[in-house]
Amino acid sequence: MAKFALGHHREASDAGCVRAVLAELILTFLFVFAGVGSAMATGKLAGGGGDTVVGLTAVALAHTLVVAVMVSAGLHVSGGHINPAVTLGLAATGRITLFRSALYVAAQLLGSTLACLLLAFLAVADSGVPVHALGAGVGALRGVLMEAVLTFSLLFAVYATVVDPRRAVGGMGPLLVGLVVGANVLAGGPFSGASMNPARSFGPALVAGVWADHWVYWVGPLIGGPLAGLVYDGLFMAQGGHEPLPRDDTDF
Protein backbone atom coordinates (compact mmCIF):
# COMPACT_ATOMS: atom_id res chain seq x y z
CA MET A 1 0.00 0.00 0.00
CA ALA A 2 1.35 3.43 -0.92
CA LYS A 3 2.46 5.64 1.98
CA PHE A 4 2.94 9.03 0.34
CA ALA A 5 4.05 11.95 2.52
CA LEU A 6 3.22 15.32 0.99
CA GLY A 7 5.81 17.43 2.78
CA HIS A 8 5.76 21.24 2.97
CA HIS A 9 7.23 24.11 1.00
CA ARG A 10 9.25 25.06 4.09
CA GLU A 11 11.50 22.12 3.26
CA ALA A 12 12.96 24.22 0.46
CA SER A 13 14.52 26.59 3.00
CA ASP A 14 15.98 23.82 5.14
CA ALA A 15 19.77 23.70 4.86
CA GLY A 16 19.82 19.91 4.70
CA CYS A 17 17.30 19.88 1.87
CA VAL A 18 19.22 22.52 -0.06
CA ARG A 19 22.42 20.49 0.26
CA ALA A 20 20.60 17.33 -0.81
CA VAL A 21 19.08 18.96 -3.90
CA LEU A 22 22.44 20.45 -4.87
CA ALA A 23 24.03 17.03 -4.39
CA GLU A 24 21.46 15.44 -6.71
CA LEU A 25 22.22 18.04 -9.37
CA ILE A 26 25.97 17.46 -9.17
CA LEU A 27 25.76 13.68 -8.87
CA THR A 28 23.36 13.40 -11.81
CA PHE A 29 25.56 15.70 -13.87
CA LEU A 30 28.58 13.47 -13.23
CA PHE A 31 26.59 10.28 -13.83
CA VAL A 32 25.16 11.45 -17.15
CA PHE A 33 28.47 12.92 -18.27
CA ALA A 34 30.16 9.54 -17.79
CA GLY A 35 27.22 7.47 -19.05
CA VAL A 36 26.46 9.44 -22.19
CA GLY A 37 30.15 10.18 -22.66
CA SER A 38 30.94 6.47 -22.72
CA ALA A 39 28.33 5.93 -25.44
CA MET A 40 29.82 8.80 -27.44
CA ALA A 41 33.34 7.46 -26.96
CA THR A 42 32.47 3.95 -28.14
CA GLY A 43 30.75 5.41 -31.20
CA LYS A 44 33.77 7.57 -31.99
CA LEU A 45 36.22 4.69 -31.62
CA ALA A 46 34.01 2.48 -33.79
CA GLY A 47 33.81 5.09 -36.52
CA GLY A 48 30.25 6.06 -35.74
CA GLY A 49 28.97 2.51 -35.30
CA GLY A 50 29.03 1.81 -31.59
CA ASP A 51 26.23 -0.80 -31.70
CA THR A 52 28.50 -3.79 -31.18
CA VAL A 53 28.98 -6.31 -28.39
CA VAL A 54 32.20 -4.60 -27.38
CA GLY A 55 30.53 -1.19 -27.44
CA LEU A 56 27.58 -2.42 -25.38
CA THR A 57 29.92 -4.03 -22.85
CA ALA A 58 31.96 -0.84 -22.53
CA VAL A 59 28.84 1.25 -21.95
CA ALA A 60 27.54 -1.26 -19.39
CA LEU A 61 30.86 -1.20 -17.53
CA ALA A 62 30.91 2.61 -17.50
CA HIS A 63 27.39 2.74 -16.08
CA THR A 64 28.24 0.11 -13.47
CA LEU A 65 31.22 2.07 -12.21
CA VAL A 66 29.73 5.55 -12.26
CA VAL A 67 26.46 4.48 -10.61
CA ALA A 68 28.34 2.67 -7.84
CA VAL A 69 30.55 5.67 -7.15
CA MET A 70 27.86 8.36 -7.40
CA VAL A 71 25.40 6.45 -5.19
CA SER A 72 28.14 5.90 -2.63
CA ALA A 73 29.20 9.55 -2.80
CA GLY A 74 25.68 10.86 -2.27
CA LEU A 75 24.29 8.26 0.10
CA HIS A 76 24.95 10.31 3.24
CA VAL A 77 23.82 13.63 1.71
CA SER A 78 20.78 13.04 -0.49
CA GLY A 79 20.54 9.27 -0.70
CA GLY A 80 22.36 9.26 -4.02
CA HIS A 81 19.22 8.82 -6.12
CA ILE A 82 20.46 10.29 -9.47
CA ASN A 83 17.23 8.96 -10.97
CA PRO A 84 13.59 10.14 -10.80
CA ALA A 85 12.45 6.51 -10.77
CA VAL A 86 14.49 5.89 -7.62
CA THR A 87 13.16 9.07 -6.04
CA LEU A 88 9.53 8.17 -6.75
CA GLY A 89 10.19 4.55 -5.84
CA LEU A 90 11.19 5.76 -2.38
CA ALA A 91 8.40 8.35 -2.23
CA ALA A 92 5.85 5.58 -2.83
CA THR A 93 6.70 4.11 0.58
CA GLY A 94 7.00 7.42 2.40
CA ARG A 95 10.80 7.50 2.60
CA ILE A 96 10.95 10.93 1.00
CA THR A 97 8.22 13.56 0.79
CA LEU A 98 6.56 14.37 -2.50
CA PHE A 99 7.68 17.99 -2.19
CA ARG A 100 11.33 17.04 -1.77
CA SER A 101 10.89 14.46 -4.53
CA ALA A 102 9.83 17.22 -6.91
CA LEU A 103 12.94 19.22 -6.00
CA TYR A 104 15.12 16.15 -6.53
CA VAL A 105 13.60 15.40 -9.93
CA ALA A 106 14.04 19.01 -11.07
CA ALA A 107 17.69 18.89 -9.98
CA GLN A 108 18.24 15.56 -11.73
CA LEU A 109 16.77 16.83 -14.99
CA LEU A 110 18.86 20.00 -14.81
CA GLY A 111 22.03 18.04 -14.04
CA SER A 112 21.41 15.72 -16.97
CA THR A 113 20.78 18.63 -19.33
CA LEU A 114 23.92 20.48 -18.25
CA ALA A 115 26.02 17.35 -18.71
CA CYS A 116 24.68 16.83 -22.23
CA LEU A 117 25.20 20.48 -23.15
CA LEU A 118 28.83 20.17 -22.12
CA LEU A 119 29.23 16.91 -24.03
CA ALA A 120 27.68 18.47 -27.13
CA PHE A 121 30.13 21.38 -26.85
CA LEU A 122 33.11 19.06 -26.42
CA ALA A 123 32.07 16.82 -29.33
CA VAL A 124 30.97 19.56 -31.71
CA ALA A 125 32.72 17.93 -34.68
CA ASP A 126 31.17 14.50 -34.07
CA SER A 127 27.68 13.15 -34.54
CA GLY A 128 26.22 14.77 -31.42
CA VAL A 129 24.69 13.45 -28.23
CA PRO A 130 23.17 9.96 -28.59
CA VAL A 131 19.61 9.48 -27.39
CA HIS A 132 17.81 6.39 -26.19
CA ALA A 133 15.87 4.67 -28.95
CA LEU A 134 13.93 1.45 -29.35
CA GLY A 135 15.65 -1.38 -31.16
CA ALA A 136 14.59 -2.58 -34.58
CA GLY A 137 11.24 -4.34 -34.37
CA VAL A 138 10.61 -3.23 -30.78
CA GLY A 139 7.32 -1.37 -30.46
CA ALA A 140 6.57 1.29 -27.88
CA LEU A 141 4.54 -1.00 -25.61
CA ARG A 142 7.29 -3.61 -25.59
CA GLY A 143 9.73 -0.81 -24.80
CA VAL A 144 7.60 0.30 -21.86
CA LEU A 145 7.45 -3.26 -20.55
CA MET A 146 11.20 -3.71 -20.91
CA GLU A 147 11.93 -0.43 -19.12
CA ALA A 148 9.43 -1.27 -16.39
CA VAL A 149 11.00 -4.68 -15.72
CA LEU A 150 14.55 -3.34 -15.78
CA THR A 151 13.65 -0.50 -13.42
CA PHE A 152 11.76 -2.89 -11.15
CA SER A 153 14.93 -4.96 -10.76
CA LEU A 154 16.96 -1.81 -10.08
CA LEU A 155 14.63 -0.55 -7.34
CA PHE A 156 14.28 -4.02 -5.86
CA ALA A 157 18.07 -4.09 -5.52
CA VAL A 158 18.10 -0.58 -4.04
CA TYR A 159 15.61 -1.61 -1.36
CA ALA A 160 17.33 -4.91 -0.63
CA THR A 161 20.92 -3.68 -0.49
CA VAL A 162 20.63 -0.03 0.60
CA VAL A 163 17.26 0.74 2.21
CA ASP A 164 16.44 -2.41 4.18
CA PRO A 165 17.97 -2.10 7.68
CA ARG A 166 18.36 -5.90 7.75
CA ARG A 167 20.60 -5.88 4.68
CA ALA A 168 23.53 -8.25 5.01
CA VAL A 169 25.88 -6.56 2.54
CA GLY A 170 27.27 -3.78 4.73
CA GLY A 171 28.60 -0.89 2.69
CA MET A 172 28.53 -2.82 -0.58
CA GLY A 173 25.03 -1.65 -1.49
CA PRO A 174 26.07 1.04 -4.00
CA LEU A 175 28.40 -1.38 -5.78
CA LEU A 176 25.66 -3.99 -6.03
CA VAL A 177 23.23 -1.39 -7.37
CA GLY A 178 25.83 -0.47 -9.99
CA LEU A 179 26.21 -4.11 -10.95
CA VAL A 180 22.45 -4.43 -11.47
CA VAL A 181 22.51 -1.36 -13.72
CA GLY A 182 25.36 -2.82 -15.76
CA ALA A 183 23.64 -6.19 -16.09
CA ASN A 184 20.42 -4.50 -17.17
CA VAL A 185 22.26 -2.47 -19.81
CA LEU A 186 23.61 -5.72 -21.23
CA ALA A 187 20.19 -7.36 -21.10
CA GLY A 188 18.03 -4.51 -22.35
CA GLY A 189 20.36 -2.26 -24.30
CA PRO A 190 19.66 -3.77 -27.74
CA PHE A 191 15.90 -3.66 -27.16
CA SER A 192 15.00 -0.40 -25.40
CA GLY A 193 18.36 1.18 -24.66
CA ALA A 194 18.02 0.18 -20.98
CA SER A 195 17.56 3.67 -19.62
CA MET A 196 15.84 2.86 -16.29
CA ASN A 197 16.19 6.58 -15.63
CA PRO A 198 14.02 9.39 -17.08
CA ALA A 199 16.75 11.95 -16.32
CA ARG A 200 19.33 9.89 -18.21
CA SER A 201 17.03 10.00 -21.26
CA PHE A 202 15.76 13.57 -20.85
CA GLY A 203 19.05 15.45 -21.11
CA PRO A 204 20.18 13.85 -24.38
CA ALA A 205 16.70 14.19 -25.92
CA LEU A 206 16.50 17.88 -25.03
CA VAL A 207 19.99 18.75 -26.27
CA ALA A 208 19.66 16.66 -29.45
CA GLY A 209 16.06 17.73 -30.07
CA VAL A 210 15.00 14.12 -30.66
CA TRP A 211 11.78 13.14 -28.88
CA ALA A 212 10.75 9.98 -30.76
CA ASP A 213 9.28 7.51 -28.24
CA HIS A 214 10.70 9.61 -25.40
CA TRP A 215 7.59 8.98 -23.31
CA VAL A 216 8.60 5.32 -23.11
CA TYR A 217 11.54 6.30 -20.90
CA TRP A 218 9.23 8.01 -18.44
CA VAL A 219 6.28 5.66 -18.36
CA GLY A 220 8.26 2.41 -18.06
CA PRO A 221 10.61 3.47 -15.24
CA LEU A 222 7.89 5.34 -13.35
CA ILE A 223 5.79 2.17 -13.35
CA GLY A 224 8.57 -0.25 -12.48
CA GLY A 225 10.29 1.86 -9.81
CA PRO A 226 7.37 2.61 -7.48
CA LEU A 227 5.95 -0.88 -8.04
CA ALA A 228 9.22 -2.44 -6.84
CA GLY A 229 9.22 -0.19 -3.80
CA LEU A 230 5.67 -1.16 -2.89
CA VAL A 231 6.34 -4.87 -3.43
CA TYR A 232 9.53 -4.94 -1.37
CA ASP A 233 8.12 -2.74 1.38
CA GLY A 234 4.87 -4.67 1.58
CA LEU A 235 6.20 -8.22 1.33
CA PHE A 236 9.71 -8.16 2.74
CA MET A 237 10.57 -5.02 4.69
CA ALA A 238 8.16 -5.63 7.56
CA GLN A 239 8.84 -9.33 7.81
CA GLY A 240 11.11 -10.93 10.38
CA GLY A 241 14.43 -12.53 9.56
CA HIS A 242 14.50 -15.68 7.49
CA GLU A 243 14.44 -19.07 9.13
CA PRO A 244 17.99 -20.47 9.28
CA LEU A 245 18.64 -23.73 7.50
CA PRO A 246 18.80 -26.72 9.84
CA ARG A 247 22.23 -27.98 10.81
CA ASP A 248 23.27 -31.53 9.98
CA ASP A 249 22.79 -32.59 13.59
CA THR A 250 19.31 -31.08 13.89
CA ASP A 251 16.33 -33.43 13.97
CA PHE A 252 13.51 -32.58 11.58
UniProtKB/Swiss-Prot annotation:
Protein name in the entry: Aquaporin TIP4-4
SUPFAM superfamilies assigned to the protein according to its UniProt record, in alphabetical order: Aquaporin-like (SSF81338)
Family annotation (Pfam families): MIP
UniProt motif NPA 1: location: 83-85
Record's comment describing the protein's domains: Aquaporins contain two tandem repeats each containing three membrane-spanning domains and a pore-forming loop with the signature motif Asn-Pro-Ala (NPA).
Short motif NPA 2, span: 197-199
Upper classification of the organism: Eukaryota, Viridiplantae, Streptophyta, Embryophyta, Tracheophyta
Transmembrane segments: 20-40, 53-73, 105-125, 143-163, 168-188, 216-236
Keyword flag Repeat: yes
GO BP: urea transport; water transport
The keyword Chaperone appears for this protein: no
Gene name as annotated: TIP4-4
